[in-house]
Amino acid sequence: MTKILKVKLMKIALPIDNNRLSPHFGRCEKFMIVEIENGEIKNKEIIENTARNGMHGVGTTSASLIANMGVNAIIVQNIGPKAYSVFKQLGIDVYKANTTSIDECIKLFLEGKLEKFE
């Protein structure tokens, strides 16, 4: 008999500036993409936020960039209504963090202690 293991694989994104959670989602320098499998971090990747220097619509453009990376959730300090709407329409959960420590944000996410934006 073959045993089938259920593997919970997900990706979360964090907007970062100087290795801290950015207070401005759309204008952050970079995004950290964290792959989680069965509650454990498997990989971290840093990507440039190519939308951040735009004149208008940087939040929605940044949201589209992240969505195209296949993320399931994003952790932010703040997010504008248009960027939030993009994530909501795509079924990507948005969580609010009250700390700027990236490690603490990830830890709180894994423990289910971050509040969802609604």
From Swiss-Prot:
Top-rank taxon: Archaea
User: Matching SUPFAM superfamilies, A to Z?
Assistant: Nitrogenase accessory factor-like
Give the Pfam families listed for this entry.
Answer: Nitro_FeMo-Co
Question: What is the protein name given in its UniProt record?
Answer: Uncharacterized protein MJ0580
Organism listed in the record: Methanocaldococcus jannaschii (strain ATCC 43067 / DSM 2661 / JAL-1 / JCM 10045 / NBRC 100440)
